[in-house]
Amino acid sequence: MKKKRLISLLLVFALLFTAAAPTLAAAEEPARRLSVGAEDGAGSRFVSFFNAIREKLAALWNRLRTFFAVRKEKVKNTMSQNAIHMLQSVEDTICDSFIITTEDGKVIVVDGGHTAETDYFIEYLRAVTGQCVPHIDAWFLSHPHDDHVQVFLETAENRAGEVTFDKVLLNFLPYELYESRSQQEGMEMVSEFNRISKAFPEKVQILNAGDVFNIGAAKITVLYAPDESFIDVNEHSVIFRMDLGGTSVMFTGDAQVNAGNKTLAEWESTGLIDCDVCKMAHHGQNGVDRNFYEAVSPEICLWPTPTWVWDNTNGNLKTLEVRAWMEELGVKKNYKAFEGSAVIGMKPRVVTTTDVFEEGYDAATAVDRLAALGCEGIDMGFDYWVFDGSPFLSDGYLPWAQSLKARADSAGIVYTHAHAPGEVDSEYMERSIEATAAIGARYLVVHPIWRDDRGNIIRNKLRFLQINADAIKKWLPKAEEYGVVLLSENVLWGASSDPRIIAELVKKVGSDRFGWCFDVGHAWCCGYAPDVLKQCAVAPMSLHIQDNDSSGDQHLNPGDGTIDWALFTGTLREIGYLGDCVMEAHHQSLYAPDAERDAILTSLLETARSLRAEMR
């Protein structure tokens, strides 16, 4: 412990000296003159020199303090997972700062906060992405107030070597408008943005109401852009909806009653106002009116709110009234920035495997049936398409897969996963990766190699890890080329049955193109209760949900076997699981008459939604 402390102190002093060295070198000549009695301006140069040193040391100290503070928080790396991070204010003041990560590796930022929040923002971003120099794909600025835009301005102008970004999205009204109204803060922030953005005009994207576009897996719908007839700068906040995974999120900036009512008038009939998550307008007080929140009807509210606003310490705010509204509206969870930075996982999509249908089923018709039943995603079982005459085995497998994606698009459903036949060294891996991309799925689940060349079960952990790591690494370039993530699942034999070893395999491979899928039924068959996940070095990126009585791999509906489902959902809550609910309970449906299949699947999906509610 003493040795570690000494190393830390040496590191701090080395960093301090490195930061101070340029200033010392630049000041060498004035300092020399001072030492021989230079008179004119010597005193002021001396003061300037030491002020510069003090400022650099203070800045470096703040960065070091922030670095260790973020490490102490144990910020969750959610790169390539769907999640929202709401950042706390380091000064317990009003500010909006959100980082969103997507399952396809995109990073989105909404606002950022005051200049003083910049060090924390950057360190937090590094922790979230696992990148020394994080890259932001899209940075939204809601409106020109300092507590929303200063982190962007500071980062773009003075910290460009620490963070990169592709584009900044906003709709600021002209400087002249704010000047004519003597709105000082609007004038100042617009002026600063205009000055700084001259260095990157090609990165500026203007948002308008009605814009719809995607940033990777996130779909953005702009519902409101500034109406200059509204006087308050807060009313010039862009309001937009984000759909990500199975969750819809309403971002409101500091919008107030006029902006909220205009948005309702133009969009309420479309159903797009109704969202799972709502960012509270204007920090949760004096924002939009109750009717707006009623239309949003959120399950979760995000409060970028300091303690003194939450408690209405000064007695002149509407926070207590708004809090009462949200309680009356039945909000299930309130995340509050003053309680610390928070990670909000997207609502897991309810997905079912196509293995609920018999081998050789009509894949296109199955898409329509699953969409009509309210399924939110499809897991395409390529393992059920290995037979003579199968389109998956034909030369036309890619056009076939592309036709299924087109069918899913028209039905309003997505393929989220696929399942490869055999193990990771099978002859079908290449076409499985290509077909997974062709149907538009992100994840390809594949079994690990569990037998050696002689057909013997591999029981030695180290041997299992080496054989599978070598096999997986062979396919990573192909997965990268096609935008697919390979997921190994725990199966039933030898080392492959231990979820902890599968998680260790992910660490050994060390690629963002490889993760793992926890099959709760397989684990139960092999003597592992669901809480084994708490012993795994890496959290799973997906789940296979099915039940059994531990005597065999029965793929029953949850509740028809002996798995402890309360333990399962409680463990997922505890580890902060962020993936989908993939139902692999296909036994009952697979062997039922087709006329009974829809009723069976409806019941299965209802069970899945109940589990999802418990997971959150």
Predicted feature locations:
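Core dinuclear metal-dependent hydrolase active-site scaffold
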Residues: F68-R71, V75-H135, I206-D274, A342-K347
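N-terminal pre-domain/capping segments
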Residues: P348-Y443, S511, V538, T602-R616
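Active-site acidic/histidine proton-transfer and metal-coordination neighborhood
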Residues: A371, Q402, V414, P421-F518, ...
